[in-house]
């Protein structure tokens, strides 16, 4: 497909058990990180134009601890522990390689930001107030997140969640967040 983003009739389809194998296969085959199970609470979408799958999104539990996000919110350890469930991680985003459409990725992110809170509420009985994502700096610039009004809050140290010896074994990632509620900081218990 090579349409202008404005000419694409975008829709998000929540992936059910019947579509899970296909979603996993696309991610395994075409996403640079491949397939790994998503952590904690999670939600997956196919992004379609009519019946054609253009892209895939995966959302899951937020990272337990990341200094740029925690500092941006104004969290201490106790408030993070109490309210982390209100942050959701955009853990996978894949526009399929044969899809060429300028501005499509930012349109998809904007659509997901509108749709996800109510879907999450329906499934998990609470409404998230902030999205986060991690963009590998050596591979990507985060242009689609910037164009969709996400906020860059800093970089990881390149340690990863399992690095207890400070060996810096994973790529540095840019941390981006997207408020889903204008009072997100108050609702998260942040202090500024």
PLM regions and their residue ranges:
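Flexible, glycine-/basic-rich loop-and-beta segments that form/coincide
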Residues: 184-192
